[in-house]
A protein has these predicted regions:
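Low-complexity, acidic/polar, glycine-enriched regions of mature
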Residues: 1-181
Length: 181
């Protein structure tokens, strides 16, 4: 079984949400980790775990970031991490997969599916490196992120739909180092 670790220096965990229905706010988590175990070289049997630190959320606006960390949204003090654990990775075509799993945000676990594009594996400076692009959507209210407000015209400030846009680079884990631990 090959073991891989997510390379945070070459990965991005981004999200997008509509603001006032007319514009998009983009954010990211800056601290995260993940592992992948796969027997097959095409990752079709991959088992994936991932978590991100809520306190690392950034939308390039300190006031908004503080609000996102508050009990109105993620409640970082009570729920410091979000996590994902895969249940299946199904090949749908050349280098295209559907990743199913359970996302936990704010203590609430829900099943989600994500679209995955496997960009290949190459020899990097420190061994094998694999690249992936992952996209998907989730409804923030499903995870208890319920805060919203209405504008004067009755529109919502923040949409319920959150789009995920994730770029991941994995490094093959040093098996000898793992055994020594």
């Amino acid at each position: 079984m090959a073991q891989w670790t997510l390379d945070p220096a070459h990965s991005e965990i981004r999200f997008k949400v509509k603001h006032l229905v007319i514009s998009t706010v983009t954010g990211q988590f800056k601290r995260f980790s993940g592992t992948v175990e796969a027997q097959k070289s095409d990752f079709s049997d991959a088992r994936i775990t991932f978590e991100a630190d809520i306190d690392s959320i950034s939308t390039n606006n300190e006031q908004r970031d503080g609000h996102l960390k508050s009990p109105d949204f993620f409640d970082a003090a009570a729920f410091p991490k979000l996590s994902f654990e895969s249940t299946s990775m199904t090949r749908k075509g050349d280098e295209v997969y559907v990743l199913a799993g359970e996302m936990t945000i704010r203590g609430t676990k829900r099943k989600i599916t994500l679209d995955v594009r496997y960009n290949g594996t190459v020899k990097g400076f420190d061994g094998d490196v694999a690249g992936f692009e992952i996209t998907g959507k989730l409804n923030r209210r499903d995870f208890g992120l319920r805060w919203n407000s209405l504008t004067e015209t009755g529109g919502v400030v923040v949409s319920d739909e959150v789009r995920l846009d994730i770029g991941v680079e994995l490094k093959m884990a040093d098996v000898e180092a793992l055994v020594a631990i």
